[in-house]
């Protein structure tokens, strides 16, 4: 299945028919009208405030910005929300400073975070027409990136160590040598589905189309490109140049 996801964003940014404010509203706010724009601008400004008063103001006002917020959610400073009405956060969740929750898309579900989830400092959850769902008690450590053009789903009690990268989609076609790769269609392979109680070590990469069974472990630095059954322990990665894009058969190694 191919979707021209990234190319469409580039076209939107270059659309001369829209004002700068209109482009900002479409990419960040996700709802029409000046009222939605002003509400978004004011409430996201609260992310800058320090101390107890900043925490209290975010706790009081962020539920009106987001689609759903449970009791006792802790919002850190300098958070970024895009299309916030499609972001749902369960009770007792903590979102650390500088995290990004981007539910961007026209018809997607957006981001759904379970109860007592931890989203670490600088973590990025980003949708490009896709969806992201995190089960209860899951921990997404600092600087992890979850990028979804289709679907990323994590079960309960999952633990992602720092700098993990999960990408559902993002496999660009590169058959057309006359067109920049970033402007060619993005190929989706079914998303990423991870069962309960899975541990991904630091720097693990999980590619599109992968299913990881419950209670599995991937060692630090692993690249997971195939399905893993329940209770699996996987580690390692290897990249080889296998062919030349210009044709002519396998490339020299």
For the regions a protein language model found, what residue spans apply to each?
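A generic "structured core" feature
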Residues: 153, 217, 222-223, 231
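Terminal amphipathic alpha-helical/low-complexity segments used for targeting or macromolecular assembly
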Residues: 1-72, 157, 164, 169-173, ...
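Short conserved AdoMet
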Residues: 70, 139, 211, 229
């Amino acid at each position: 299945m191919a979707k021209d996801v990234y190319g469409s964003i580039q076209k939107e940014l270059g659309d001369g028919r829209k004002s700068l404010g209109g482009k900002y509203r479409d990419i960040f706010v996700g709802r029409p009208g000046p009222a939605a724009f002003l509400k978004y601008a004011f409430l996201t400004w609260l992310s800058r405030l320090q101390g107890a008063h900043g925490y209290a103001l975010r706790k009081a006002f962020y539920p009106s910005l987001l689609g759903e917020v449970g009791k006792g959610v802790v919002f850190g400073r300098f958070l970024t929300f895009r299309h916030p009405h499609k972001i749902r956060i369960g009770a007792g969740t903590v979102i650390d400073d500088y995290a990004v929750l981007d539910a961007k898309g026209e018809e997607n579900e957006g981001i759904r975070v379970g109860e007592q989830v931890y989203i670490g400092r600088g973590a990025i959850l980003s949708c490009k027409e896709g969806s992201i769902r995190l089960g209860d008690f899951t921990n997404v450590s600092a600087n992890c990136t979850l990028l979804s053009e289709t679907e990323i789903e994590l079960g309960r009690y999952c633990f992602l160590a720092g700098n993990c990268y999960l990408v559902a989609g993002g496999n660009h076609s590169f058959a057309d040598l006359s067109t920049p790769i970033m402007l060619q269609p993005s190929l989706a392979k079914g998303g990423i589905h991870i069962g309960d109680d899975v541990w991904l070590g630091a720097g693990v990469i999980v590619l599109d189309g992968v299913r990881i069974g419950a209670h599995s472990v991937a060692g630090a630095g692993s690249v997971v490109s195939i399905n893993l059954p329940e209770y699996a322990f996987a580690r390692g990665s290897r990249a080889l140049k296998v062919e030349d894009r210009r044709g002519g058969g396998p490339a020299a190694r």
